[in-house]
Amino acid sequence: LTLSDGQYASCRKHGFEVRIRDCRTVTPEDYGTFDAIVSVGAFEHFCSLEEYKAGRQDEVYRNFFKTVSDLLPVGGRFYLQTMAFGPKMIGHEAMDIHADNNSDAYVMALAAKHLPGSWLPYGSEMITRNAEPYFKLINISNGRLDYIETIRRWRIMLRSFNVRKYTLY
């Protein structure tokens, strides 16, 4: 399942069965249950800044974990890969698109501008607390430094001149 037309086209091209659909609305009646479910990079888009401000972040995450749990048989596996704010992250009220480009205030404002409807969970504790009624945690790892390097390389490539890149837009 995906919400991305590009991911849909790529999956079809490679012979996968795929549907465009919000995974949070799927029930066992739709497709049955699955032996395993993988979620990569979607979780951080399930809760909006508005829902966070309204105090609904935990509810949004609990509902997601219940939906996934309902789609798995006993003994089924779930893999979640997501980003989360660290313990030193500034509050949403400190976001400032005019702040220094290397500041948390700027990065947060930039993310809110370019990823509307998305707000990260606050730490792995928030994730595990909401998953706990439905899942047993087997492993947790932090790829923060890997992601920082990924972002660094993206910035270099995005800022570099490339004729093909400009013809696409």
Located regions from the model:
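Conserved SAM/SAH-binding beta-strand->alpha-helix loop
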Residues: 2-6
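Short alpha-helix immediately C-terminal to the canonical SAM-binding loop
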Residues: 8-11
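A short acidic, Gly/Pro-enriched loop at the edge of an enzyme's catalytic core
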Residues: 24-40, 44-46
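A short hydrophobic/small-residue beta-strand
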Residues: 78-79
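Short conserved AdoMet
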Residues: 47, 72-73, 132
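Conserved SAM-binding strand-loop segment of SAM-dependent methyltransferases
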Residues: 14-27
